[in-house]
From Swiss-Prot:
It comes from Mus musculus (Mouse). SUPFAM superfamilies: Snake toxin-like. This is Prostate and testis expressed protein 4. Pfam families: UPAR_LY6. Its main location: secreted. Belongs to the PATE family. One of its GO terms (cellular component) is extracellular space. GO terms for biological process: modulation of chemical synaptic transmission; response to wounding.
Amino acid sequence: MNSVTKISTLLIVILSFLCFVEGLICNSCEKSRDSRCTMSQSRCVAKPGESCSTVSHFVGTKHVYSKQMCSPQCKEKQLNTGKKLIYIMCCEKNLCNSF
């Protein structure tokens, strides 16, 4: 193997490794409604073990607002308290927690 081939091979290996190291990118929004962030829109990079999440708040069948974030130990669930429903959604792909 000549030196150019060795360097090319090394570069491919390093770039492949960087793809695995890159963190999960999530949408972050303090308050969203009607598919739009209305307060504090940004992005966060999930730490190891975290996922992207959306917490949606409903009264009856009416969507009141949602919140998007990076979440540690996210578990999907529905919480019913009388007329209020809170739905927690977790996902693990870049920008999967859209507004």
